[in-house]
Curated annotation (Swiss-Prot):
Superkingdom, taxonomy of origin: Bacteria
Pfam family, one: SDH_alpha
Family: Belongs to the UPF0597 family.
InterPro entries: Ser_deHydtase-like_asu (IPR005130), UPF0597 (IPR021144)
GO molecular function: L-cysteine desulfhydrase activity
The name this protein goes by in its record: UPF0597 protein Clos_2050
UniProt record, GO biological process: L-cysteine catabolic process to pyruvate
Transmembrane segments: none
């Protein structure tokens, strides 16, 4: 496939709208599909098995159209009212009556959720049982990728693969140099990547909601209020922090609005897009370079997550999406290939130690940190200041550095991930 077409195809697959945090959404989507396979039969039991990472990210995050958090209500709503054709927006259209029925399902203890002992990062298995039959739906590898479907013992789809520590795409883009991907994107026209601007508009709306209303722990709104008081400067860095955090404040509290996700994560989408919006507000950019910058950001996020995993013990918003935003801003400011490589090294050298301890309202603080580091790393590189190679995990090239980060994520953070989950489960009394 021609390089530009592969880039466009990848962007269209990886940059899609999502309603709610994508881990509980994946559970709801699996439940919705399993219920559709079961038809009108009355459910006697719903057995849900998820990977440790899905469990971790779904434990404390708000669910749209409810005032609740967690996988149980997400799964129950998927059974009661989810429509699988809505994909990652499966929870859109939920009404109060649906929530009441979902509560009845949970009260009757018909829904169970357990952790499946798998090293697969993204895995959701839903088994529904009725007096007259049963159904199974399994999602693996991506939040919306069904790999197994069965209806009363009849297998309808079987694409299950043996779990690996990270389900890596065979996309040849991720073996290329990032500078070559950027060069190709810089030649694309609006007719080819103009759709990138849809995500900018979508994520700006949710950021504005986070600024207008008290949601989550109000990280973005607090920055805004202190800018208004003159305590903080109304500059690029604070605007990037404010907008990015505000989007997460709203989203993690379960706001009934979609976000444009990136590589399977809504918060990654916010982090990949909103610092660029902040730059655009301070230093207006024409539509074409703006769309190109967004494409660079999303492609870089996908590139890094190819190596660290779509879910991991590292905060993908910080080290992947934040790096995408950072090099996009550097590119808009005229950075050449060497300075873009330097920006990547600065970001990874800064935020490689940021852990993921699940999706929750506190993520807004991490997104603010990532947005701030994105501006700082770009400005440092533009001024010729880059972390030297062999300082820690920083390699000779940007790609070497990303691969080193991947080794850290897959090998070094394996036990850290289990320890994080152990601590979280202990606090939940599980």
């Amino acid at each position: 496939m021609e390089l530009k077409n592969l880039i466009i195809k990848t962007l269209k697959e990886e940059v899609v709208p999502a309603m709610g945090c994508t881990e509980p959404v994946a559970v709801a989507l699996g439940c919705a599909k399993a219920k559709e396979l079961l038809g009108d039969m009355d459910i006697t039991k719903a057995e849900i098995l998820v990977s440790p990472n899905i469990y971790k990210n779904g434990l404390s995050v708000g669910i749209p159209n409810t005032n609740e958090v967690g996988l149980f209500i997400a799964g129950a709503l998927g059974i009661v009212a989810g429509k699988s054709e809505k994909d990652l927006q499966v929870l859109s259209g939920i009404v109060e009556e649906d929530v009441v029925i979902a509560h009845e399902l949970l009260k009757e203890e018909k829904v169970t959720i357990d952790i499946k002992p798998t090293i697969e990062k993204i895995y959701v298995e839903v088994n529904l049982y009725a007096e007259e039959g049963s159904s199974t739906a399994i999602i693996q590898g991506r939040h919306n990728e069904f790999v197994y479907l069965a209806q009363s013992g009849n297998i309808l789809l079987n694409g299950l693969q043996e779990a690996t520590s990270s389900t890596k795409s065979t996309n040849p883009l991720f073996e290329m140099k990032i500078r070559d991907i950027i060069k190709e994107i810089s030649e694309l026209g609006m007719d080819e990547i103009g759709f990138m601007l849809e995500g900018l508009e979508m994520n700006e709306k949710i950021a504005m909601e986070g600024l207008k209303n008290t949601s989550g722990i109000s990280v973005g709104r607090t920055i805004y209020e202190n800018i208004q008081k003159g305590i903080l400067a109304d500059d690029l860095m604070n605007t990037a922090m404010m907008l990015t955090a505000a989007g997460s404040d709203a989203r993690m509290s379960g706001i009934r609005m979609p976000v444009m996700s990136s590589s399977g994560s809504g918060n990654n989408g916010l982090t990949a897009i909103l610092p660029i919006l902040a730059y655009h507000k301070k230093f207006p950019v024409e539509d074409r370079p703006l769309a190109q910058a967004l494409a660079i950001s999303h492609m870089t996020n996908s590139y890094i997550k190819h190596y660290i995993g779509r879910l991991s013990a590292l905060c993908g918003c910080g080290v992947a999406a934040g790096t995408g935003a950072s090099i996009s801003i550097a590119w808009l400011m005229g950075a050449d290939a060497e300075k873009i490589d330097g920006t990547i090294k600065n970001m990874i050298g800064n935020l490689s130690g940021m852990i993921c301890d699940g999706a929750k309202v506190g993520c807004a603080l991490k997104l603010a940190t990532s947005a701030s580091a994105a501006i700082q790393s770009a400005l440092l590189a533009l001024n010729g200041h880059v972390i030297p190679s062999k300082n820690g995990i920083i390699g000779d090239t940007a790609e070497d550095t990303i691969k080193n980060l991947g080794i850290l994520s897959e090998e070094g953070m394996y036990f850290a991930d289990h320890t994080i989950l152990k601590v979280m489960k202990a606090m939940e009394g599980v």
